[in-house]
Regions:
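Conserved nucleotide-sensing/catalytic segment adjacent to the nucleotide-binding pocket
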Residues: 80-120
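C-terminal helical "lid" of AAA+/P-loop NTPase domains
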Residues: 175-179, 186-200
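Conserved small helical "lid"/interfacial subdomain of P-loop NTPases
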Residues: 150-170
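Short regulatory helix/loop adjacent to the ATP-binding pocket of P-loop NTPases
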Residues: 124-139
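Conserved AAA+ ATPase "SRH/arginine-finger" region at the nucleotide-binding site
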Residues: 141-153
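Post-Walker A helix-loop "phosphate-sensing" segment adjacent to the P-loop in P-loop NTPases
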Residues: 63-74, 82-83
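Walker A/P-loop nucleotide-binding motif
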Residues: 40-58
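A short, basic N-terminal segment
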Residues: 1-34, 38-39, 200, 204-243
């Protein structure tokens, strides 16, 4: 297993106060806040949800709090030499996780009084592991699901994205976007970045006409052309490097 940083591209800070809570993620957040009071002999929590659902953000918050090491499968059968608490990112049978290494990490963490936070798209207890002992261990894992966001969460996430980049956007524009966008965290990231790029490229404010253009492009798939354009954050970073 190799150590990899969590994906913090859409996060301004791995701070508990920076995480937006709603019905979709309240249970998962409650379990993160309850640590180290996690049930079971092995003290393992499994956060389950689709990509960009907030699993990595919660993992980062927990990692900062516990000093956890973040791991992702790379074909290495040896568990890390240091650490008592671990975040295992994007756990999946299909992604080549070494079952023997995972089994030994579960046992070692329990013996050391540590904890495991498993991030996955489906419950690890329902995955078709071949190793019977590992399957037995994972059946006892506590599961907390992150559900699709509601309108209130989508609006707050959009506000946060633009506020973090010091970009002004009005409530009517936000309401327009929320009423027409897909109910997913991934959609927030993609649409907000597209607005950011178009605003920079065309030197336009984040207005209702711009939002209409972006949402129309997402409806017909033309937004893919915008991916080659830099966001204001990316351009600022480039200018700083050149100076």
């Amino acid at each position: 297993m190799a150590q990899l940083p969590l994906d913090l591209q859409f996060i301004s800070a791995a701070d508990r106060d920076d995480f937006i809570i709603g019905a979709c993620n309240r249970l998962a957040t409650t379990w993160i806040d309850r640590w180290p009071d996690w049930p079971g002999q092995y003290r393992i929590l499994n956060l389950v949800g689709p990509p960009a659902s907030g699993k990595s953000h919660l993992g980062a918050i927990w990692g900062v709090r516990t000093g956890a090491v973040t791991l992702r499968s790379s074909g290495d059968a040896n568990a890390p030499d240091e650490g008592r608490h671990f975040v295992l990112d994007d756990v999946s049978v299909d992604d080549g996780w070494d079952e023997e290494a995972l089994f030994h990490l579960v046992n070692r963490t329990a013996n050391d009084g540590g904890s495991l936070l498993l991030l996955s798209r489906e419950p690890v207890s329902q995955m078709p592991w071949k190793l019977a002992d590992l399957t037995s261990r994972l059946r006892a894992v506590t599961v907390a699901r992150l559900e699709p966001p509601d309108d209130a969460i989508l609006r707050q996430l959009l506000e946060k994205y633009f506020a973090d980049r010091q970009l002004a956007i009005s409530l009517p524009v936000l309401d327009y976007m929320v009423s027409r966008m897909e109910r997913s965290f991934q959609a927030v990231q993609t649409i907000a970045a597209a607005m950011d790029r178009r605003s920079l490229a065309e030197r336009r404010n984040l207005t209702l006409p711009l939002a209409r253009d972006i949402m129309a492009e997402f409806a017909d798939g033309a937004h893919a052309r915008q991916q080659a354009l830099p966001t204001q954050t990316e351009q600022t970073g480039s200018q700083e490097e050149d100076s």
